[in-house]
Amino acid sequence: MNDGKATIVMRLTALWAFSEAFLGGILHAFHLPFTGLILSSIAVLCIVCIALQGYTKGQIIKATLLVLLIKAMISPHTPVSAYVAVLLQGAFCEFIFLLGTPFALSCFIVAIAALMQSAFQKLIILTLLFGVDFWSAMDEFLNSIAKQFGFGTVEYTNYLVLFYLMLHFLVGIVV
């Protein structure tokens, strides 16, 4: 890789790192919704732009490790799950681009997979932390509210989870 492209890759890596550290830190600190959706979208754009500069083996994983290092130094209060998300995204993207599939298809796969990984990670963590009973309790709570307004009982969590996953999937397509 020539010096010009190396400089661009370093700048893109810095952009990714500082978006993870600063924007991610702010979103996590204020517990704002859709943190993973926003940060994953930015990560995908940065990773794809890095690959666009002429992908070489190990390039994305090196950028990922650098992003993790900067994120840990600047925003140490970030939950461990955020670091896991970045590492999984970087490793998966490295794998997809390493396969040598056509660039446009790789970008499409990377975008959808990164956003879906973010969605599933959140759902898995909620289930592990609160158990399956969490979803039953949510249904019970939402049905009690619905009954007050004269609506029947429905498994609302199924619809909420489906909406959440579809939102991430659609953003993955758009990104």
Regions found by a protein language model. Give the residues of each.
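Hydrophobic transmembrane alpha-helices
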Residues: 2-73, 77-78
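Helix-loop junctions at the membrane-solvent interface of multi-pass transporters
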Residues: 26, 30, 100, 127-128
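Juxtamembrane membrane-interface segments at transmembrane alpha-helix termini
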Residues: 48-55, 72-80, 95-103, 119-126
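"Short basic amphipathic alpha-helical interaction patches in structured regions
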Residues: 64-66, 82-87
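Membrane-embedded alpha-helical hairpins and interfacial helices in multi-pass inner-membrane proteins
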Residues: 107-175
